[in-house]
Amino acid sequence: VEEYIYPAMEDYKVDFVVDSGMHSRTIQLPLKPFTLIGATTRAGLLSPPMRTRFGITHSLKFWDEPDLLLRAEMSCDMLELDYEPEALTLLAKRSRGTPRITNRLVRRCRDFAQVKADGVLTVSTVGAALELEGIDKLGLDDLDRRFLRTIATTYRGGPVGIEAVAATLGEESDTLVDVVEPYLLQA
């Protein structure tokens, strides 16, 4: 795929090979000028030539609690959901610095509030919903806690490789690298 993207990025054209053998020929399709924006959580999987073709690179950081609180308020407003401000503060604290998680937790808390309460997000309702989800006061879920417990107890605090931890937990190492470690390393 990268081989098709390079000439598109540099020369605004794409070459396609049609047929094979002595009947093969190349068709060149011109492209209108464009801006390519890419996003990944796994930049290391891109080849170095591909990474260096992007003129500007940025790394996104975790959101702080006030911004997550605003995101939670916006989600509640879009869902036409009543809430106590303190309930959303609790939710923002447990959102792992990620707005997409904030949105997911708002929806889960809404579902819980509609079934188990009066539909309003209160501190007690959000607390109960997050407890049901297995999310503790630090925003850690069951996998996070198992990960930390494995390093602390099974491997006596380390050092230990990710493959060994993954095998012990019965999880894929990619899951631990992509889901668990980024938050734990910045928390």
Could you say what each language-model-derived stretch is?
Residues G170-Q186:
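Short amphipathic alpha-helical interaction segments
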Residues L45-K93, N103-R104:
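Conserved AAA+ ATPase core "coupling" helix
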Residues E84-P85, S95-R110, G119-V123, L140-D144, ...:
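The conserved phosphate-sensing helix
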Residues E2-T35, L45, I56:
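Conserved catalytic/switch belt of AAA+ P-loop NTPases
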Residues R156-L169:
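Short acidic, hydrophobic short linear motifs in intrinsically disordered regions
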Residues V126, L130-P159:
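Winged-helix-like regulatory helical subdomains adjacent to P-loop NTPase cores
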Residues V1, G21-S24, F34-L36, T41-L46, ...:
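Conserved nucleotide-binding/hydrolysis micro-motifs of P-loop NTPases
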Residues F112, T150-T154, T168:
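Short amphipathic alpha-helical elements of helix-turn-helix/winged-helix folds
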